[in-house]
Amino acid sequence: MKTKGYFLYFVWCMIQIVSGQSSQSDKIRFLDFTPVIDGKLDRKLIHFKQKEFNHFFPFDNPAASRAKITYLIAYTPTHLYLYIETPADSITYRDRGFINGDGFKLLLAKPQKDSLTDEYYDIAFSPSKDKKYWARKRIWDYNRNQSHGKKLSTETRFEEIVYNGKCGFEVLLAWKDVDPYHPWFSEQLGYNLYFAKAIANDAATGYSVVKDEGIWDEEIPKRNFIPLVFEKPKRINKSVLIAKLTRRNIRVHDSFPVDLMALSKTTEIRPVQITIRNDSSKIILDTKIDCSLKNKTQHKLTSLKYSILKAGLYHFFSRSGNDTIGQYDFVVFPKFDFDSIRSQIVQNQYRLEYETVNTLLFKANEVEKQLHQLKPYETGKKILDKYFLFETELHSFLKENDPYKGITKPYRRAFKSKYDNSFQPYTIKLPQDYSPTKKYPLLVFLHGSGQDEQGVLNQTRSGGNFIEIAPFARDMYNCYDSDSSQKDIMEAIEDVMDHFPVDKSKMVIAGFSMGGYGALRTYYQHPELYKGVAVFAGHPDLANEWLGSGHPSFLEDQFLAPFSKIPVFVYHGRKDGALPVAKAEELIRKLKSNGIVVTERIMDDKTHEYPDDETNKIYFEWLTKITEK
């Protein structure tokens, strides 16, 4: 975000705090039964009062009128219940309906000191005729991670229905899917709810409980919410016992903190069985705890006096009678000394090429940083896996072997930036028939927003005949328009050329989504380097739309002049709900009107996604053709 953006964000934060939008609270009713989820309001809840959304957003539809859209939230010991009702005789099904209509997003947040938070789950629900639609029910954003990659379990249920002249949207969200959030274990929780109502001409209006630019803008670092107050249970049909690990990452020799929450109809002693297995399913601990229950809500914090000596992934399983009352994965980390690790690398830096040293130093720093950022309720399994891989590479290096020699699957390298001395990564993939005596064309592929470059090259982006690299955009939302992004791309290319047999006369730049704009922007910066540009699900004017005016727009003739001598490949899905197909079609028209050769693939059935097999086949043939000239 630019300096101007940070200033505007600061002003926005002050407005939220002064206006007190997060100072209210909503009281959430306790349910002693599990609602039936069919899209209709559960019949036992028809007398509960529904709330209206506080804010209405017509967006670019000034004639749009506000509808009376209501919602109801309640909870059980195992689930959060949500019902939304709209006055309509049909449901509109669109890609990413939670933004494009009809659909909604639920934010569950952990309050922080400044009334905004960067600890949250942003959960998306997009009604769909296909119940297996990938974005039907999904954790869209977690602690500002924007991975869009975590599905909700089958214990979370979502249905929609049209009945009696209205549309109902009903959710039963499993607390286990939003761990550690739970009304009986969390000191306080907050929420926001946003509903996108589809209207004519593929447009939508919006409704929210509190105003929060983060609903639409992934660059907003903190989110706004309203506190939740959960009603204490007045009566229960049966006793409830829940076991919870208060930490899901520990060090070797640490004990296990277990929190037992009990809610009982009577006073009784209940035995609790706790079993811990390693990742090979071998039992390493099997013990029993007697829990004294009383006719009230109780917390019993227990620390298991058992030390695990070996780092790894473990599984916690707790039962009471025939009931499973707690089931968690947790990770035991070794005790690290990163200063000693870096010292070993530097002391041996002259044994192998300097880029291997840079890569190992980058990986050591990355693991240390991620461990520091790890929350108590997160396992850190990916960090442990990353460390084990790094440890293997380090041992190979200390034996004077290059751990990266001969790898043809995608892997990460790093260079030391000559501009700020930071270690910057990129992912590289070599052809299966790679030989250091043969020269290869180079494909530079730029990733999308809110993510890094890891995983981009897991699918071939060139048909397998190119050396492929995916530079990391350290400013993950700036459309590759900053000096640092352009310098990082150039330094990644220089690093590859220094260590691999690249034919520098046969380079192509490509990108997906934000990376599509980045490909246009990067070619514009260095047209002398590339034989062609490929734009996948991109936006030719994205920087001006996201960052404000003053950036190259590739819908303007002045910025298209450098493209006159090279071919351009453009792919887009007509159902793309993230970046509209109209912009891609306008780009194609502008390129052609400027005499630029365009290969276009506008697919009627595709959304915001990578190309289909047929498009890839055409694209790979295009790559081969333009680099053989």
Regions found by a protein language model. Name each.
Residues 21-267, 275:
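Structural preference for beta-rich elements and adjacent junctions enriched in aromatics
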Residues 296-297, 311-313, 322-327, 331-440, ...:
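A domain-start/cap signature at the N-terminus of enzymes
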Residues 432-438, 479-513, 524-530:
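Gly/Ser-rich "nucleophile elbow"/oxyanion-hole loop immediately N-terminal to the catalytic nucleophile
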Residues 438-448:
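Short beta-strand element of the alpha/beta-hydrolase
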Residues 454-471:
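Short amphipathic alpha-helix adjacent to the substrate-entry channel of hydrolases
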Residues 455, 525-566:
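Mobile cap/lid helix-loop segments that gate and shape the active-site cleft of serine hydrolases
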Residues 570-572, 576:
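Short beta-strand/loop motif that positions the catalytic acidic residue
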Residues 577, 581-629:
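C-terminal catalytic histidine-bearing segment of alpha/beta-hydrolase fold enzymes
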